[in-house]
Amino acid sequence: MSALVELDQVSAHFTVRGSGWFGGAKQVLRAVDAVSLAIGEGETLALVGESGSGKSTLGQMVAGLRAPTLGSLRFRGGPFATKAARRAIQLVFQDPFSALDPRMPVSSLIAEPLVIQGIGTQAERRTRAALLVEQVGLPRDSLNRYPHEFSGGQRQRIAIARALAPEPALIVADEPLSALDVSIQSQILNLLKSIQEERRLSYLFISHDLGVVNHLADRVAVLYLGKLVELAPRAELFARPSHPYTQALLDAVPRIGRARRRQVALSGEMPSPLAPPPGCVFHTRCPKAQAICRAEIPLLAPAPGRPDQLAACHFKE
């Protein structure tokens, strides 16, 4: 599988001012810290982790909304900050209620990315909007209506149609199901899968719902405190997670027919990204932590006997 987007030691750091009457010393918040991975053509790569792990910030960098502080991104082996890359990468936001301008009809909302990028004539844009609204399962008369006239699931369909308008190669989907009712989530999930099959799209799918990830992803990247701690094919990761943090995330999800093994329970809160722990960033919550974990940063390396499953742990399984 050829790489569509490559991230090489990408970091996102923010400078924040301390508290107090006169402001404290400036501190560096490491939202994403030296992450390297690739998204393949036609692949769904899922990003998972707790709130504050850096998932959305990483997604913003891939979508071109935020430049990395350190490191670099490449698009199909070439420069990332190009018009071709901007057109090829689109974003679907978490909240369909706030992602769509309430003053614009659906036809204009879907066509807006084409206007911004100078694609097609006005007539061609109208034609594409009409085709897309039907492809996402809405009637053609939706084109003249406004966002407030639709349900949450229908608005997310409109947002998906809008993202598809420039014919992208990659869609960054940031928690696209979390604001929807459970009954609607499966419909949108099936829509995303069918669109991918028809168009050979790639997805960077950001989610906290491991059940959804298990149905959609080809590979899974696990983030903790801005660090990539595990990267593996979906089936291997769900069957035999290597990193203790991944084990804990999976153990928190009830599953029928789960293989019997000692469960890993998370204790305590995630440390502040303003003051990450030395060594392995997970050692403050890890039941396997030893002296080496507090002193040395583990490298992302293959798990024993599984070359495609990478984990950053001194005691990976």
Predicted regions and their residues:
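A short, proline-enriched helix->beta-strand linker immediately N-terminal to the Walker B motif
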Residues: 165-169
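Short catalytic/signature loops enriched in Gly
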Residues: 3, 16-23, 28, 231-317
